[in-house]
Amino acid sequence: MAASLLVVHVHVRVKPGGEEAFRAASLANAGASRREPGVVRFDLLADRDDPLRFVLVEIYRSAAAAAAHKETPHYAAWRDAVADLMAEPRRSTKYVNLSPDDAGW
C-alpha cells in the first residue's frame, strides 16, 4: 500500500458541566490546527444524543505531520485546558485513507 493520509478519530467523554469549556478550547485548537501545513482537515463533532461525547476527526498528510501537530503551542494549550474536563481518558483510532484518492482532498 502506498503512503496515504493519516486519519485519526479521537473519542472524548467530558464530565457533566464541562461541555462548553471543552467545546471552546477544542474550537480554538481546531482553528489553529487547520493552519498547520500538514493538516488536511480538523473537525470537531458533538454526539447528537449525548452532550458529553465528542469526536475530533484529524486528517494529516503524514505521520510526521501528526507528530508535528503535538509539538505546537495550540495543542499544548488545548491538552492542558481540557485535562480536568475529561470523564475518562480519550481514545484515538488511526486509519489510512482508501477513498477518495488522497489527491481528492
Where in this protein do the model-derived segments appear?
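Residues at secondary-structure transition points
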Residues: 1, 13, 20, 51, ...
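Glycine-rich beta-strand-turn "strand-cap" elements at beta-sheet edges
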Residues: 1-6, 44-52, 80-105
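N-terminal first-folded block
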Residues: 6-36, 40-44
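Short, well-ordered beta-strand segments in beta-rich or mixed alpha/beta enzyme
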Residues: 6-13, 43-70
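Non-catalytic surface loops within mature trypsin-like serine protease
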Residues: 14-16, 62, 96-98
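An amphipathic, aromatic/His-enriched active-site/gating alpha helix that lines ligand/cofactor pockets
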Residues: 28-40, 59-93
